[in-house]
């Protein structure tokens, strides 16, 4: 694959992460990580797919919450063979009684690796710097 094709494949994984997270497909989201991959959030850190899935389930909880979707922007990808360092920004938009609103925003820092022809997260750091005070 060319460098452009590799970068596009990485962007597809980033998009799939959001689709799976936004649709409560947590096991499928965790499957985008390597077997020893780490999901590092403001609410905790999970290493390995089982821990990643358990952490997202704990964070999301069981209480009803407004529907929200992630938007990822300003994606920068630095390829180095079968590894990549990625930086991007994200924002969530959610429903509220007053209409759509920004729920939270921040940045992702990713270490990705290509395994068996698939790009996967080895490490995803989420810096959440815009959010409701509640």
Regions found by a protein language model. Name each.
Residues 85, 105-133:
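Short beta-strand edge/turn micro-motifs at domain boundaries
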Residues 63, 99-101, 113:
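Short aromatic-glycine motifs in intrinsically disordered, low-complexity regions
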Residues 43-44, 97-101:
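Short, solvent-exposed loop/turn segments at secondary-structure boundaries
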Residues 1-31:
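Short, low-complexity N-terminal intrinsically disordered segments enriched in polar/charged residues
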Residues 18, 62-65, 97:
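Short helix-to-loop capping/linker segments positioned immediately adjacent to catalytic or ligand/cofactor-binding
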Residues 92-94, 128:
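Beta-strand elements of well-folded, non-transmembrane domains
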Residues 26-91:
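A solvent-exposed, acidic/Ser-Thr-rich amphipathic alpha-helical stretch
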Residues 70-72, 103-108:
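Short, surface-exposed coil-to-beta transition loops
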